[in-house]
């Protein structure tokens, strides 16, 4: 691939961050498989401060479709159990006195379809964000061209580079979506 312009590199960097955000959000989507990423947004009351669970405990994937949460301070067992049970994820946490265990039930076919629909919406939002980056960066190129800093041909070349980067990132977003869709439907 030919060396990219600074305009294209800037667009590429912003689009890369958008894709990373999309992947991070998909990690939080509940499939039937146990994952610790789902618990990143659940906060527990830690001495009066809402604190993410992963900052007060060790999370690990256990056997039999469970996540095991081992708090560093045993006093946190009950608040962790309470935070998980009151979350909107539909999990049931069990405190055995040493650790909190969270079972991941198999989602029904209907739940799986709803999850796929939700991640499809996330994909579309990601594509819109990518296109907005393209629009903003092409607008910058046109402004610079109008100032006379670059020629018409250079501006056209930069716009084509930015469009190519958009296509690459939209294709990558589709691949990420398809992997997650497959994971949901097969779990």
From Swiss-Prot:
Function: Responsible for the release of ribosomes from messenger RNA at the termination of protein biosynthesis. May increase the efficiency of translation by recycling ribosomes from one round of translation to another.
This protein's record includes keyword Disulfide bond: no
Keyword Repeat: no
Superkingdom of source: Bacteria
Protein name from the UniProt record: Ribosome-recycling factor
Any one GO BP annotation for this protein: translational termination
InterPro entries found in the cross-reference section: Ribosome_recyc_fac, Ribosome_recyc_fac_dom, RRF_sf
GO cellular component: cytoplasm
Localization per record: Cytoplasm
């Amino acid at each position: 691939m030919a060396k990219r312009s600074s305009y294209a590199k800037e667009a590429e960097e912003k689009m890369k961050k958008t894709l990373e955000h999309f992947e991070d959000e998909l990690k939080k989507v509940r499939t039937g498989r146990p994952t610790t990423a789902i618990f990143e947004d659940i906060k527990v009351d830690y001495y009066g401060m809402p604190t993410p669970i992963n900052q007060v405990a060790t999370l690990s994937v256990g056997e039999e479709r469970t996540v095991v949460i081992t708090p560093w301070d045993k006093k946190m067992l009950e608040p962790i159990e309470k935070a998980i049970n009151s979350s909107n994820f539909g999990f049931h946490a069990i405190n055995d006195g040493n650790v909190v265990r969270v079972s991941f039930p198999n989602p029904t076919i209907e739940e799986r379809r709803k999850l796929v629909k939700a991640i499809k919406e996330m994909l579309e939002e990601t594509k819109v964000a990518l296109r907005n980056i393209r629009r903003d960066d092409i607008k910058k190129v046109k402004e610079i061209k109008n100032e006379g800093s670059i020629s018409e041909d250079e501006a056209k070349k930069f716009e084509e580079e930015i469009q190519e980067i958009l296509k690459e990132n939209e294709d990558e977003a589709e691949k990420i979506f398809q992997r997650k869709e497959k994971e949901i439907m097969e779990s």
